[in-house]
A protein has these predicted regions:
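Conserved small/polar residues in nucleotide/adenosyl-binding loops
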Residues: 213-220
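Active-site beta->alpha loop and helix N-cap motifs at the rims of alpha/beta catalytic domains
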Residues: 2-152
Length: 222
């Protein structure tokens, strides 16, 4: 069963997961942070459990609780995007299903972090995205990692992932403006409806000025 496709054309802040001094999740702080971000009309989603949200440091039950808390912070009005970080495909599918059940409407699909050092077999990323959508219906964001890692997708891989059902967005953090300037136009031409999001700190102006669309996912602290 597919999840309704949210329009993420706007600002997509990535709030941190706040903690109490004794290391517990600070749910009142989540309510304050999420409800405040939800007051801005430019904010089209809250991206949780990514790098800023420390999703990989949380237990499964904590991940679910964080998603539910951010959904509740805006009474479901602002879509919640959940980072999907599980290493194996089956693990990622199960994580994505928990995210759907908790109220997430899209997933930021991380590459398997085992690929960071050793790279990936051809077709493995495509299988990851395909399985997640086919088994959970979660809308997917193609996550392009920095160029200096071994899990940065070549253009052909990006095009093949973007062509898959359920992939409606790409968050690009390639951090190589030669690749941005040559690959983004190809993606845009091949998939005019693909929402292109920049997460470049050091190249933010470049990626906004040269993009027809103004979208960015940034860390947000309470």
């Amino acid at each position: 069963m597919s999840v309704p496709v949210p329009n993420l054309r706007g600002l997509n802040p990535a709030p941190v997961t706040p903690f109490t001094p004794d290391g517990q999740i600070d749910f009142p702080a989540i309510e304050r942070l999420g409800s405040w971000l939800g007051t801005f009309p430019e904010v089209t989603s809250l991206v949780v459990l990514g790098h800023a949200g420390e999703g990989t440091f949380l237990t499964q039950s904590e991940q679910v609780a964080v998603i539910e808390a951010f959904v509740a912070s805006t009474a479901g009005r602002v879509p919640v995007v959940a980072g999907i970080t599980g290493e194996g495909t089956k693990v990622a599918v199960e994580e994505a299903q928990r995210a759907v059940d908790a109220g997430a409407t899209a997933g930021l699909i991380y590459p398997s972090h085992g690929w960071l050092r050793f790279g990936f077999q051809p077709g493995a990323p495509q299988d990851r995205y395909r399985a997640i959508y086919e088994e959970t219906g979660l809308n997917e964001i193609l996550f392009q990692y920095p160029d200096n890692t071994k899990c940065s997708y070549d253009l052909d891989t990006q095009l093949e992932i973007a062509a898959l059902p359920g992939v409606h967005y790409t968050k690009n953090g390639v951090r190589n403006m030669k690749r941005w300037d040559t690959e983004i136009p190809v993606l845009r031409q091949a998939f005019p409806e693909l929402t292109i999001m920049s997460c470049h700190d050091e190249y933010l102006l470049h990626t906004l000025v040269r993009s027809e669309e103004r979208r960015v996912g940034k860390e947000c602290r309470s």
